[in-house]
Amino acid sequence: MALVDLVRAGGYSIEYPQFSSMAKLKEFPHSEDGKLVRLLSWHEGVGLGGGLFKVSTSSTATGNDGTVVVASNGVRLLRVVNGPIWADMFGALPNSDIDSMPAVAAAYAYAASVNTDLYIGVATYKFKGSTPINIDPSRAGIIGYQGKVRIDCSEFTGSIVFSINSSYSYTPAAYYNNLSPALQGLYVLGAKTSGVDGLLVGRETVGADKSYNGQTEIRECTFDKFDRNIRMGHNSWRFVFYKVNSLNALSPNGILYVPAGLDDSGEILSFYHCQFFDGAGSNIRLSCSSYTMVFNTCSFLNITFFVDSASSATVTCNGCNFENPGSASTRRYVDISAGHTNVFNIIGGSIVTNSNPGQTQALLYVSTNNLLNLVGVTVPYGGHYQQEQELGYHAFIGGAGTVTASGVMLQLRNGAGTCPLHSSLSTFSNWDFGYGNLNAWTVDKGAGTSSVVEYLANAGPKGTGGAMRVAPVSVGTNVSQVQAVTNPGMFSMSCMVNIATTSGNAGQISIGFLDAAGNSIPGGVSANLGTTTGWKVIGKNTLRGKVPIGAKQIRVNVQTVAGADVKYAYLLCNVVK
């Protein structure tokens, strides 16, 4: 009885009326000011959303059916709140026939008004209607309990389910306190409905004031099957995504979309342990200039990361995984295809290509005046690599931009072979006969003065680009070039060859090394041309190796036997370290 006496001494009664549902609580004509009543359940017989309410005959507060209830006679009942705010207090119910969105929206509005987070209990909830929930990270977030809350938005018809944007601006003084998650622990599922997006990060329209969104965090959430799962808006800067997944979107840009022209946006968007997956044609696209994104130990699965910003976008992937699990489609992983001064860094991590009928695209692509940096990665290779079908030559990376490589490993013991990285790393001058002649190449016809060694325009594998035709008459012909090289390092070379006629093996391409005095040293390799006619790749599993210790020069020699008629194009060799 001591506990009962203590409760009564505190001004509370333990003999108070009980109501089985919110509807019955509102129907009763409450009139005794200060009286405590108990709501057993918001919905009849469910056991969720109950609690103590205190009758207030003087209150004129607006009812929200959660913390302020207006009875049938107009009297207010005020919820006794002494802990976290839960969505079920406002009528949210894990039931596929009940639209819980109005309840969650009302619960969040109250939580934000008192600067505390809203919690949603473990279950699956249905969201219908068309009005988004706008989250103000400076005031309150929405947290799914234990990270196991599922929200079914398959019948939602609005343009956005959730948007995140602070009500605080830079002036007169920023709140500087977006330290609790704006969203956490939610699996938000759509139905691939056109025009319905899962999450807008930032503002939909440009405002005269600037929202202070720094340090806003989205944690342990999944957005699945929306038109665009995650879309960046105006004032999107210094947002943090931790263990966020974006899966199976409808739009070609639906996995993660950063549109052009965003106002006051792009200062360090950070992603940690996130997963981006599709496989049906939806991708990541960064189109906004001066936008910086950093991905740490994230996975990019069966998607392409497009960068078509007009200028100055920067993407850094630290320890990330690029892969095509379970896919039979040829796919590019990174495509920097427009603008200028865009930078994409791949630092550590893994690049994996599971076998498919034919990898006919270069895995990575960087257009002119843009930069792709590879640091501390192993370059994969497979027998299904057929990048020459797209590029006209055999290389891991396509495009006319610039590639740098530091601490990069070639798979020299891969039975399928290796390939050079990129044309900008070419060891040899005029590797593609792009000078419009054979300059930089030394021709040795020997005694066969009538042998043909000539430049041909628009004669490459795709009917464009230059080629070198060699047709020795009486003795074989050698075409060679020597360039400086440093060690340690690894080399890989590929060459496109088209044999028109030959009576046997048409010749050989060899790579050798010289010391500082010009003496040959061990470590060279060679590849026979064979007899097969038509354009083909030479060097996949033969023209590769380590630069030997002491090497100061690298020499390539193209030998064509007498009686053969061969075209050569794109003699691409890279030395990386």
Swiss-Prot record:
Asked whether the UniProt record includes Ribosomal protein among its keywords, one would answer no
Q: Which GO terms describe its biological process?
A: adhesion receptor-mediated virion attachment to host cell; symbiont entry into host cell via disruption of host cell envelope; symbiont entry into host cell via disruption of host cell glycocalyx
Q: Which GO terms describe its cellular component?
A: virus tail
What subcellular locations does the record give? Virion
Q: Which of UniProt's keywords are assigned here?
A: Degradation of host capsule during virus entry, Degradation of host cell envelope components during virus entry, Host-virus interaction, Viral attachment to host adhesion receptor, Viral attachment to host cell, Viral tail protein, Virion, Virus entry into host cell
User: Keyword Ribosomal protein on this protein?
Assistant: no
On assembly, the entry states:
Homotrimer.
Q: What is the recorded function of this protein according to its Swiss-Prot or TrEMBL entry?
A: Functions as a receptor binding protein (RBP) and mediates the attachment to the host capsular exopolysaccharides. Displays a depolymerase activity that specifically degrades the K2-type polysaccharides of Klebsiella pneumoniae capsule.
What is the similarity comment for this entry?
Belongs to the K2-specific depolymerase family.
What is the protein's given name?
Depolymerase, capsule K2-specific
Q: What does the organism's lineage look like at the top?
A: Viruses, Duplodnaviria, Heunggongvirae, Uroviricota, Caudoviricetes
